[in-house]
Amino acid sequence: VDYHYPQPYKLTDLKPFIGAIHHEELKGYDFWGMGDLDLVYGNLGMVINDKNMARYDVITTHNYHIAGHCCFCRNNDYYRNLCFKIKDWKSKITDEKPVSLDEGEWSSLVCPNLRTIRRIHYYVCRHLGIHYFKVLDLLNPILHRNVLLHEYWTSPQPKDGEQWIYDVKNGSITDYKGRSLPYLHFI
């Protein structure tokens, strides 16, 4: 594939292809991942730990789709090559316009039941006043057993007076409610 574009943001469309592109370099590793440069890490062990790595094939930090800014995939043939199941993948990665393959079509391949969950919420739960994220937290573990979709609220939009703490010495980040965060994402 001939890939060279003047806009660096277009590189984000290659994220689902990282496992395939770096297949040789990944030999001997259990997981491969994708991330953004605008993250400040705290305790990433909240997300990536022995328990989660033993139980899940994909670990991500949103509950409504794969978080392209922080996602880890088991290093096996299935997840390395899932990107090639994206419809018209060659034309999408060679088109100049970014199309967010990581959080869009690839996310739908990793988590095929998210569409069903959206429909359950839209047609049933929202009329009962049940928040979409509550429905996701209930149904994701049932419908996506091998994927940890957990919302960490790492892309804040702090309001005046809120205090967020980044403790460099201890490698920890605490939001204004006192919750520990694995990282902060500056959008």
What are these model-predicted stretches?
Residues 69-77:
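Short glycine- and hydrophobic/aromatic-rich loop-to-beta-strand nucleating segment
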Residues 79-187:
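Catalytic core and acceptor-binding pocket of nucleotide-sugar-dependent glycosyltransferases
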Residues 28-42:
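Short beta-strand-to-loop acidic/aromatic patch adjacent to the donor-nucleotide binding site
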Residues 41-68:
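Conserved donor-nucleotide/metal-binding helix-loop-beta segment in metal-dependent transferases, i.e.
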Residues 32, 43-47, 81-85:
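A short secondary-structure junction signal
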Residues 12-17, 37-38, 99, 103-104:
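Conserved glycosyltransferase catalytic-site signature
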Residues 10, 67-70:
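Glycine/small-residue-rich pyrophosphate-binding loop that anchors the diphosphate of NDP-sugar donors
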Residues 1-27:
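Active-site-proximal specificity loops/subdomain of glycosyltransferases
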